[in-house]
Amino acid sequence: MTLRQAIDLAAALLAEAGVDSARCDAEQLAAHLAGTDRGRLPLFEPPGDEFFGRYRDIVTARARRVPLQHLIGTVSFGPVVLHVGPGVFVPRPETEAILAWATAQSLPARPLIVDACTGSGALAVALAQHRANLGLKARIIGIDDSDCALDYARRNAAGTPVELVRADVTTPRLLPELDGQVDLMVSNPPYIPDAAVLEPEVAQHDPHHALFGGPDGMTVISAVVGLAGRWLRPGGLFAVEHDDTTSSSTVDLVSSTKLFVDVQARKDLAGRPRFVTAMRWGHLPLAGENGAIDPRQRRCRAKR
């Protein structure tokens, strides 16, 4: 059997299993095992039956709807390649729309950026890499309450200035020392309505804690909007991702705080409503009761 024939059979198996991107996935899995990229697969000569056995096993796992990214162990996101796997939400291409918006904004020379619900560190690490590519600096804080997600985030943030904080964004008066200090806040929080029907890759493999946002999908979004109102300085910028059914609800929520101007609904790369942006205005909120971080909110700087 040739590699081309093996890929053809794999693509047919994946299509029969309901995988939308069957051919693409079959090629990516082959490239992963070959240690090359898809474009160079025609140049690859499989060393023997052992390769085809491994390929059969990994394709069978994909046919069981194990996410492609779990099998490969990485996912591309903007300018970075992130480590992902069981226990952490796999970043989606849709979220790159927030990244594109954020990188187009005018920020101070060394801004303070917060990524709330950072998960694998996707937005935080991508923003850090973007600024590094331009020779620019920033202080970037990623926040999440999942130990497993933060393990991946630490690995992804290695060699960057990203700081990671273990904390629940729904905690009242979280991190009061950030009040009125943040220049840019982005968030891809859990936002899927609880009753939504999901693809097997999502329902069976992504952590539910990172997916579902309450009956209407707005529970964590509401908490994040509250934090943005506190943490952003006047003129600070905010972007939050939402379900494609809750764009109007998110716009109404942000607008109802009376703390933001230029509230805009925005679409993802596929043209679906996906995130809302706004600018903070008005007086700074009162400082928190104390400036200390709760010891449960452990902070760590990624190893260089």
Swiss-Prot record:
Name the gene that codes for it. prmC
User: A Gene Ontology biological process annotation?
Assistant: methylation
Briefly, what is this protein's role? Methylates the class 1 translation termination release factors RF1/PrfA and RF2/PrfB on the glutamine residue of the universally conserved GGQ motif.
What this protein is called in its record is: Release factor glutamine methyltransferase
Q: Which UniProt keywords apply?
A: Methyltransferase, S-adenosyl-L-methionine, Transferase
Q: Name one GO molecular function term.
A: protein-(glutamine-N5) methyltransferase activity
Q: Entry's PANTHER family? A: HEMK METHYLTRANSFERASE, MTRF1L RELEASE FACTOR GLUTAMINE METHYLTRANSFERASE
Catalytic activity from the UniProt record: L-glutaminyl-[peptide chain release factor] + S-adenosyl-L-methionine = N(5)-methyl-L-glutaminyl-[peptide chain release factor] + S-adenosyl-L-homocysteine + H(+)
Q: Where does S-adenosyl-L-methionine bind?
A: 144, 188
Q: Which family is it part of?
A: Belongs to the protein N5-glutamine methyltransferase family. PrmC subfamily.
| InterPro entries associated with the record | DNA_methylase_N6_adenine_CS, HemK-like, Methyltransf_25, N5-glutamine_MTase, PrmC_N, RF_methyltr_PrmC, SAM-dependent_MTases_sf
Entry keyword Transcription regulation: no
Q: Where does substrate bind?
A: 188-191
Question: What Pfam families is this protein classified in?
Answer: Methyltransf_25 (PF13649), PrmC_N (PF17827)
- Please state the Enzyme Commission number of this protein: 2.1.1.297
Other information: Was identified as a high-confidence drug target.
